[in-house]
Design a protein with these regions (language model features):
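Long, low-complexity, highly charged intrinsically disordered regions
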Residues: 1-59
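Extended alpha-helical scaffolding segments
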Residues: 63, 68-156
């Protein structure tokens, strides 16, 4: 499957989330990361572009589940379009897909089609010869996304 087809499938899986305004923006998460108040969503300033994602990648660590699901398809698309390059956007995205999950959960909030899209994305990032992120993506897969992953519940 080409990256173009995978990107289309990712956006289809996240179509509801991608079309709504997020409660928290990447810019807002970045502000919180710098101990500043999160600015409200601004339709002009918070338009998603490569420049926007590159400016605020680590804001993803501050996102609630709804906002996180809003940005996931855009960050996965970016990572696939720039698969041969190391970037903070890809590293922040992959880090956001690692356990432990939060309370309320982000990873466990994904619907089955979204989980499938993420798993297919991670498979490409971990095993494609052109990927600059094979090590981190493989670690993410082994920690949460594969049947042999570290148990999600320590009581397992």
């Amino acid at each position: 499957m080409s990256h173009t087809d995978l990107i289309a499938d990712i956006f289809a899986a996240f179509s509801a989330e991608g079309s709504a305004f997020p409660p928290m923006t990447l810019r807002g998460g970045d502000a919180l990361d710098r101990d500043q108040p999160a600015p409200p969503f601004d339709v002009l300033v918070d338009t998603i572009s490569d420049q926007y994602l590159e400016s605020y990648p680590w804001g993803s660590g501050w996102l609630d589940a709804v906002s996180w699901r809003h940005y996931l398809p855009f960050m996965m698309e970016y990572a696939l379009r720039h698969i041969t390059e190391s970037s903070d956007v890809t590293d922040a995205l992959l880090t956001s897909l690692r356990p432990p999950d939060r309370d309320p959960p982000r990873l466990a909030s994904l619907a089955k089609p979204q989980e499938t899209a993420v798993l297919r994305f991670l498979d490409v990032m971990a095993y494609s010869a052109e990927s600059a992120s094979t090590d981190l993506a493989a670690m993410v897969l082994s920690e949460w996304w594969t049947p042999e992953a570290i148990p999600k519940d320590l009581d397992d």
